[in-house]
């Protein structure tokens, strides 16, 4: 399973990136079969290496047991905040989301809640730069899944800035939690969300998107969230995906045994 474009992760220095890219080439060359968790990743390996891969995604469960009282712990109100849940690394585009928010008409109206450990080098940088702003709230990692799903569910909108592929589990969880999603514009996110999200590719685009977010929420939130929930139930249920993995593994074994 090839995961994402690991060599593009900016937490690695240039030498490590080159080594990881070499690992990618060796994996493609020497593996009998490749698995891609995202159609964008599958297309990448086809175009770059001429190698086919099997699309087998991750999954998520649709939840119904949300607890609005969880918000009190963070001083939040239902529908009254933006949220981003991510590892605080450059390739997840926290800077783009935060700077876009700061320049928008939503700054001071709805706080931006950042969920993720701040003890990474980039997390420390973000804390130093933005941590004193009362409208940007770094709450650390949240590992109580029910609590995290509730905080996602009651958000006004959810930023998803991941950019190096493939299918990020936190995106599926946001969809399964009924979030109105604001996604970084790349092939991996579009492969999952299709037209059921708003997209931004720069700080200015994020600002423009947020300046019109109230109208977008009124016009599209119900439609987009319902469609995303249907996508999770149809394409990303664990029962379906476990069956697909089992079938593919059986097929691989049959090939190794000569059919």
Q: What does each model-identified segment do?
A:
Residues 72-103, 113:
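Conserved donor-binding/catalytic core segment of Leloir-type glycosyltransferases
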Residues 124-146:
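Nucleotide-activated donor-binding/catalytic signature segment of Leloir-type glycosyltransferases, i.e.
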